Amino acid sequence: MSFRFKALDQRLVLTVAIAIALTACAKKQEPAAEAPAGEKPAAAAPVSDALEGQVDIVAWAGYIERGETDKGYDWVTPFEKDTGCKVNVKIAGTSDEMVSLMTQGGYDLVTASGDASLRLIRGGTVQPIDIARVPSYANVDDRLKEGSWHFVDGKHYGTPYQWGPNVLMYNTNAFKTAPTSWSVVFEEGKLADGKSNKGRTQAYDGPIYIADAAIYLMAKQPELGIKDPYELNEQQYAAVLELLRKQHPLIQRYWHDANVQVQDFTNEGVVVSSSWPFQVNTLQANKQPVASVIPAEGASGWADTTMLAANAKHPNCAYKWMEWSLNAKVQGDVAAWFGSVPAVPAACKGNALLTDTGCATNGFDKFDKIHFWRTPEASCKTQGTCVPYSRWATDFVAVMGGR
């Protein structure tokens, strides 16, 4: 990818410092836990329509910007001025952390990825929303409106926010041509620069990465009969774990911090890994020799949903934020900053920060090649019983430990 946006160079001189600043800001604004774990979910309809004066959100870094990192990127201040609802943000680094924070209570909204959303729904941690209170839901990409990671039993559990693919990022000095298969991260081999990929490869450090290995085996070993990378029977699951164990010696780091991965590609000799468009855009803006591709096997991806806590203390401000978040200008600005694709297609045109080519660069037309993150459950559609997420979580810790 070659997409570069206006303020990227300014904010990426000290990439890690940005992440620290975001975290520090979030800590200052973190609300105290307010809802006991056993408290019954609040009714979807508010007792009053009066705005409560604040909304507390658990979010990925970079998703809720108020211009503190770059003045050109601020979709919080206008919302606060318009509604009187102060936005407090708690940054989470992983989906597991998001689930933990929401389970503890004290937050109104969460920008949950698909590997967290079903856990939040099944656990009663979030509640269905009334889309009649979110008029802009009508503008959401039809491909996302009833995504299986947030639309359950005929109910909408939140509003789509942003989405994107997990791309294969590579150093163009190590690869003369773009790799066409995920084999370059799963199997040891000599690269175009004459060196092995061993110790120069990374993998995502979340249990959901098991699905990436399953996607590869769907094509490499079709006899396994994998139809959905999030629905694996015992035999399929065993084969996927074996692939991941064989991959382990190749790995320089299991990553989850995008900024750390940027540094590893810049200074630590890493040349190939699964990644997000954000890192690709960042490294290219810093004049690093990287590019990205979605290989022939396809890719996993994330479609994040703004979900409402079952015990939300500020539901009216929360609904105002959900409506605001689907504004085309906001959607485009978020996509430009984060390197994602807007949930509202209208945002792809006429946004000065994103530009009219930004959506295509960030993967808008790759939707059908993406297997979006979804919490694995024992009850599954493609076969009788599947290995649930609890097993994925336990076993992936062992894989990362070389066991």
Please place each PLM-identified region on the residue numbering.
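Bacterial N-terminal signal peptides that target proteins for export
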Residues: S2-V13
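Bacterial N-terminal signal peptides
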Residues: V13-T23
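Bacterial signal peptide processing site
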Residues: C25-K28
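Early extracytoplasmic/lumenal segment of secretory-pathway proteins
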Residues: K40-L120
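Extracytoplasmic ligand-binding site segments that recognize negatively charged/polar headgroups
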Residues: W60-K71, G106, T111-V260
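Extracytoplasmic/periplasmic substrate-binding proteins
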Residues: L250-N311, A346-N362
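Mature extracytoplasmic/periplasmic domains
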Residues: D304, A309-W373
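Conserved C-terminal helix/tail region of periplasmic/extracytoplasmic solute-binding proteins
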Residues: K369-R403
